Amino acid sequence: MSLVQKLAGSKIKLKLEDTMKKYVGLLLMGLMGASPAIADTVKVGYMTTLSGGAGIIGKQMQNAVNIAMEHTGGKLGGMEAEVVFVDDQRKPDVAKQLANRLVKSDKVDVVAGVIWSNLMMAIHKPVTRSDTLLISSNAGPSPIAGAGCHENFVSMSWQNDQTPEGMGKHLQSQGVKSVYIMAPNYQAGKDMLAGFKRHFKGEILAEVYTKLGQTDFQAELSTLRAAKPPATFIFQPGGMGINFVKQWKQAGMDSVSKLYTVFTVDGVSLPALKDTALGVISTQTWSPDLDNAMNKRFVSDYKAAHGAYPSFYAAQAYDTMMAIDHAVGEAGSADAAAMRAVLAKGGIPTTRGPLAMNTNQFPIQNVYLREVVLDNDGVATTKVIGTVFENHKDAYAEECKF
């Protein structure tokens, strides 16, 4: 054999060995699920409403996510991170399409966000059954808290019934005998009124469901005036709440009935309502004046960046990202099973303080009584005036069997 033939043979052998090494390397990376670059990056698909009248809510949530990422140095659990924002347009079919894209095409580790309960119902099965972690920043519909629960779902907000249960208990304790109640006609609206009725034992004079997205409440207010209820309880989030409270005041309804709310008068609506909403009472699991270090930092930085108080939507969006940061850091990876195991243990750092988790992976938390007041600068905000429930659990956890 000539020298040239020997060298050629050696080169062929080396090429074959190199090729085999490459294939073995690719095979190992395939078995591990990703290349090192991808494995070291946590990818979050954040779904919220960024367009239309409800876009004001989604933009606050987006602002809060960005502040959270600033606070974590652009990383989650010490790993490089990427957040993909998507606009669900407040449409269930759009939300479902986006959820499938995030899971199948973008291959996110976590799908988070979601304001509306009907949208959460649309994406819950497609996401959780793909073995992707789904973390709610707001929506907490009752079907997925009970028999329809799934181990890949975690709430960083509340179960829909929890907060209005606080208002029902408060009015019961105040000796109120009868109430007129109202909410939009969708899953969350039904849950809110169910929660209120669970703890209020007096007479329900009327249970009214309005159209989701409704802006004109003159007909409802006229009927309410004729009923002359001593108390009125409403759930009208976002722009619906702004219009309802303005029309309530313009119609002089304060002389007819005392107004009580949940998720209606907050950091979304107060910049528009200003002192119109002074004195309105609500229940909530969060308030900008909660006295803990994380909340103070978040509220201060949000106000500095955006010139207004954050809403509870923003606080929950911030808490969601801090929960992911905590879960990835403790688990050492963005593996869904590892992250949910960390979150299920509780002790999650949030603007509400360390958060405990129920067996259905919804929070166990306080429900506060709040009043709209003016701060030292004359800006309308909410102030905690009492605690209705301590370490409050939702009503559906016992039905949840993972």
Task: Show the residue positions of the predicted features.
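Beta-alpha junction/loop-to-helix N-cap segments that form part of ligand/metal-binding clefts
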Residues: 56-61, 71, 75-144, 156, ...
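Solvent-exposed, acidic/polar segments of extracytosolic/periplasmic ligand-binding ectodomains
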Residues: 42, 347-402
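Venus flytrap/periplasmic-binding-protein-like
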Residues: 88, 135, 142, 212-213, ...
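Extracytoplasmic "Venus flytrap"
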Residues: 45-64, 86-93, 115-116, 182-190, ...
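Periplasmic-binding protein-like
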Residues: 102, 106-115, 135-137, 178-183, ...
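Extracellular/periplasmic Venus flytrap/periplasmic-binding protein
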Residues: 97, 142-145, 150-251, 286-297
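Sec/Tat signal peptide C-region and signal peptidase I cleavage site
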Residues: 34-39
